[in-house]
Regions:
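Non-catalytic scaffold segments within catalytic domains of secreted glycoside hydrolases
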Residues: 222-255, 271-277, 282, 320-321, ...
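Glycoside hydrolase catalytic-domain groove-lining segments
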Residues: 253, 259-260, 266-320
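Conserved, mostly hydrophobic/aromatic
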Residues: 149, 264
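A solvent-exposed, charged loop/short amphipathic helix patch at secondary-structure junctions
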Residues: 113-117, 161-197
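Alpha-helical scaffolding within the catalytic cores
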Residues: 79-81, 131-134, 242-255, 285-297
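Disulfide-braced loops of extracellular cysteine-rich modules
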Residues: 353-363
Length: 422
């Protein structure tokens, strides 16, 4: 899981360990039922996740808390992965915004075109050249951390550019009319859509390909992908949390993106309107289920055994409720980490390790037997201690299964391949 953005200047990501996309349910690529695994799936990889049954990754620029206000967060004590000196960009976790990776084309608020404005007007070669230079300046050659590309100005699917993003549709159609004034409105829209989507695909796909080629050990993916579009509306009389109708078909059309990604980073940011509501769990649940569905169907390159990590982005605050880390905010954050979040992560990590040892001989991580089932590592105080408690072995065996780390096989991950583990 990644802890993510503060509203304006900061990303506050906390990344928790890769979620499992293995299931013993009947095969399907629709809904929440995921494919049957004949053999235990190989656990999602990446050196930062290697041999870790559970991981939380910090991506908040809290270096300023110590440097400016002498407020220190002892993240290492709680086994939370952090960049050196808690820097925003580092070798464990980094994020690239629109103006910090190549020449990303977008329309400014006043309508002017930046780097061509539209994907079909961008200079892909110049973009890739600059992007590679920027990556080399920021990342070490052996970089093996989390690498997130955060481009949110437009979507690669035409119909998902609604609201203010419809300007990309309007200007794309205007471009076609200038080139082909003989076409009807329907023909103009169809051609504009095709050119936009083809160019958007090429831009995103080639960016990922280049990044993975130069830093193959990194976990590369786009923030907010796959999407679910399940925000609760004021008009909703009953909220199920399910993804918007047509979401799965749209995400299936992005198979080219999933095949180039080495990690998926769905957003589970909670809006203020869901504070204290059980609907928050429904929203998060279905966003993660859709990401797991995508990860279960497509794999990076030709790797058909190792799962793509699903690393949800979460905030420590509700969206748009914080803007800047002043001394007071830093103190509140420190207290929250030291008294609530840190102990919870520590206790949950302990249970995950215990499950790994009991079920998987310490050579894999535990995953629910059925993703839609309710058993979890956390429960009520009658069965466990106050935080995450200590489940007995029977609970683990009845509700969880193993995803073996690379180099291990078998239902209990007890068969080792020394050559693979080197």
């Amino acid at each position: 899981m990644v802890l993510s953005h503060l509203s304006l200047p900061f990303l506050l990501p906390l990344l928790v360990s890769p979620l499992s996309c293995t299931s013993r349910s009947p095969p399907s690529t629709r809904g929440v039922v995921l494919p049957r695994a004949a053999q235990p799936a190989v656990a999602a990889g990446g050196l930062i996740l290697q041999d870790r049954p559970f991981a939380v990754v910090w991506n908040i620029p809290t270096e300023d808390c110590h440097r400016r206000y002498n407020v220190s967060l002892d993240l290492g004590h709680f086994d939370i992965v952090e960049n050196r000196q808690q820097r925003f960009h580092g070798q464990e976790m980094t994020i690239f915004y629109r103006d910090h990776l190549g020449k990303y084309p977008y329309l400014s608020p006043d309508g002017s075109r930046v780097n061509g404005g539209l994907p079909q007007l961008s200079d892909l070669s110049a973009h890739l050249s600059l992007a590679m230079t920027q990556m080399s300046g920021l990342l070490q050659p052996n970089f093996s951390g989390l690498a997130v590309i955060d481009w949110e100005e437009w979507w690669p699917l035409w119909e998902r550019n609604f609201g203010t993003k419809m300007e990309y549709q309007r200007q794309s159609k205007l471009l076609v009319r200038q080139e082909r004034p003989d076409l009807s409105e329907t023909e103009t829209t169809a051609l504009a859509r095709r050119k936009f989507e083809e160019s958007a695909r090429r831009f995103m796909e080639e960016t990922l390909k280049s990044a993975v080629r130069v830093h193959p050990k990194g976990l590369w993916g786009f923030y907010g992908f796959p999407a679910c579009l399940n925000k609760k509306k004021k008009t909703d009389k009953s909220y199920t949390g399910r993804c918007q109708a047509g979401t799965e078909d749209q995400n299936d059309r992005l198979s080219w993106l999933w095949r180039q990604s080495t990690a998926l980073y769905p957003s589970v940011y909670l809006p203020q309107s869901l504070a204290g509501s059980t609907d928050a769990a429904l929203m998060v649940r279905h966003r993660l289920l859709e990401a797991l569905r995508v990860a279960s169907v497509w794999h990076h390159g030709n790797n058909t055994t190792q799962a793509i990590p699903v690393l949800p982005y979460a905030r420590l605050a509700f969206t748009h409720s914080l803007t800047f880390l002043d001394k007071h905010q830093c103190s509140l954050l420190r207290d929250y980490v030291h008294t609530v979040l840190g102990p919870f992560v520590q206790s949950l990590s302990s249970d995950m390790k215990r499950c790994s040892l009991q079920l998987c001989n310490g050579n894999g991580r535990c995953a629910r037997q059925r993703l839609t089932s309710s058993p979890a590592m956390t429960s009520d105080s009658k069965k466990t201690n106050v935080l995450t408690g200590s489940f007995n072995g029977k609970h683990f065996h009845n509700n969880f299964m193993c995803e073996c780390y690379p180099g291990w096989t078998g239902q209990e991950c007890h068969h080792g391949n020394r050559q693979k583990r080197k």
